């Protein structure tokens, strides 16, 4: 997973609770990645987690890469991660909703990689809000 902010925390917790085998948190600020990894150990007892600098991440040998950074919100943003070393079966997911087709997802499609759009996150949030507000 790329990023260690608020959205990354929620996604990391959901992945751990869903039974992910291992989670690597890569972030520009290594201390923030380590803090999130430590939180997952402390609060969820999930120990198959590691942290590493984003600059040292190549995406090789993983099943999914989730961009939970802000990279991709603006047309001139750099790609969150080059996809040169990614397996053809690696799912590329982006939480950016606008634009829906970020440069990163476009790059993944051009390489024939499976992708997952950020819009799905909003759809589930709307569903949860609807259920929550209907309870009152």
Task: List PLM regions with ranges.
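Glycine-rich adenosine-cofactor-binding loop
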Residues: 1-16
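Hydrophobic Val/Ile/Leu positions in short beta-strands of Rossmann-like dinucleotide-binding domains
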Residues: 1-2, 25, 94
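Short glycine-rich anion-binding loops that position phosphate/pyrophosphate groups of nucleotides
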Residues: 6-7, 70-73, 98
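Short, well-ordered alpha-helices that flank and scaffold nucleotide-derived cofactor binding pockets
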Residues: 13-17, 38-42, 106, 110, ...
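NAD(P)-binding Rossmann-fold cofactor-contacting core
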Residues: 18-44
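Rossmann-like NAD(P)-binding element
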Residues: 29, 56-78, 93
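Rossmann-fold cofactor-recognition segment
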Residues: 44-55
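Rossmann-fold NAD(P)-binding glycine/threonine-rich loop
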Residues: 75, 82, 88-136
């Amino acid at each position: 997973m790329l990023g260690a902010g608020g959205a990354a925390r929620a996604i990391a917790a959901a992945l751990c609770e869903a039974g992910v085998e291992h989670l690597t948190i890569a972030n520009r600020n290594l201390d923030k990645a380590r803090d999130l990894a430590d939180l997952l150990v402390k609060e969820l007892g999930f120990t198959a987690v590691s942290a590493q600098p984003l600059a040292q991440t190549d995406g090789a040998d993983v099943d999914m890469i989730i961009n939970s950074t802000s990279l991709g919100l603006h047309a001139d943003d750099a790609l969150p991660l080059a996809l040169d070393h990614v397996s053809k079966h690696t799912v590329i997911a982006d939480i950016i909703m606008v634009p829906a087709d970020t440069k990163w997802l476009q790059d993944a499609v051009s390489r024939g990689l499976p992708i997952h759009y950020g819009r799905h996150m909003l759809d589930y949030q709307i569903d949860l809000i609807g259920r929550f507000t209907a309870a009152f």
